[in-house]
Amino acid sequence: MKRKILIIADNCDVTKSVAKNIAAVFGAAPFANWSAAVVSAKDFPPTKLLSANAFLLGCEKPEPPEFTDIKVLFTHINLVGRPCGVFSPQANAIKYLSGLVRDSEAVLGNPLVVTKGAVDSRKLKKWVGGIIGGKA
């Protein structure tokens, strides 16, 4: 059975694009035993998080309106030991996302600072490997 990673992003073009690029690295070596699902933070069903073995969060700016419910959820849910990563084009958004998951006790990996345009798949594989384990 494949392990699941959930990628939650705001509606910004940059973060949506990066989320899709991240999802594309799953299903093939070295992450062939993983499947990825990308969901909009706006339409995020909290039950999806419970079935995920790991999760990633991305937004362009701190406190986007789409993350209001997620912020509440993460103050009440226990995700102790679950691998987590955050990505954004802005350092202050990474700080926001990192703080968001703190109370959940998820294991936060190194953040990914993204720029406009495509992100190199080798860089994404290395980043993901650092979060969920595995070499890329």
Q: What does each of the following model-derived ranges do?
A:
Residues 14-18:
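Short N-terminal binding/cap micro-motifs at the start of the first secondary-structure element
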